[in-house]
A protein has these predicted regions:
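Catalytic-core regions of hydrolytic enzymes
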Residues: 1-83, 91-98, 102-106, 187-193
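Active-site-adjacent mobile loop/cap segments within catalytic or ligand-binding domains
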Residues: 47, 94-193
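Acidic/histidine-rich, surface-exposed loop or edge segments in extracytoplasmic proteins
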Residues: 87-90, 155
Length: 193
């Protein structure tokens, strides 16, 4: 609703209900709509119930085992192996959207940490990371995946149930999109056909 209130921004949702859409199809929707920006919003999970915080990813090779493991879990429904994904990422890494995606990821991450810290003082800024997420592969535009809190952490799961907390997440993402938009000339986040 926040982005939709901006006359210079057209928002395209890949889904409006809680039904599964294949990861590749989400990116295909953005490409068909000729989107200028792709933001995939997720709630994180970990076997470590104490894990908490926010992290934002852009497409590239995984830089640490944790990022690779998270990408493998998120990608499981696609049926693609991590080795095959690494080959795809190598091809895509030549694309000039890498730097733009990193820049947008930094804006998203900074905004989430700043907006959520006042209501979740124990939040951890897990930083901007890179990993081969299927949902980001094939995007024709700068694209990021934001992990907005941990469902596996009881305290953060309870926060995610609160309207105010979700509104803060939305506000942080909204402001990141606007900041990114200001860095470019004549950008629209998505254009309708």
């Amino acid at each position: 609703a926040l982005l939709a209130s901006q006359p210079s921004i057209d928002v395209v949702l890949t889904r409006e209900t809680d039904r599964f859409i294949p990861l590749e199809e989400r990116t295909a929707i953005a490409n068909r709509q000729r989107a200028d920006l792709f933001l995939s919003i997720h709630a994180n999970a970990s076997t470590n119930r104490k894990a908490r915080g926010v992290e934002t990813y852009f497409l590239n090779f995984a830089t640490n085992p944790e990022a690779e493991a998270l990408a493998a879990r998120e990608n499981a429904s696609s049926g693609r192996t991590m080795a095959r994904l690494q080959d795809l990422v190598q091809t895509i890494a030549l694309n000039n959207k890498l730097d733009e995606s990193r820049e947008f990821a930094e804006m998203v991450q900074g905004g989430l940490d700043q907006k959520l810290r006042s209501v979740n003082p124990q939040i951890r800024d897990l930083g901007v990371k890179q990993a081969p997420f299927v949902v980001l592969i094939g995007a024709d535009m700068p694209s990021v995946l934001a992990e907005v809190s941990f469902l596996s952490n009881r305290a953060e799961a309870l926060l995610l149930k609160q309207d105010d907390y979700r509104q803060r997440i939305a506000q942080a993402l909204f402001e990141a999109v606007l900041r990114y938009q200001r860095t470019l000339k004549n950008i629209q986040v998505a254009s309708q056909p």
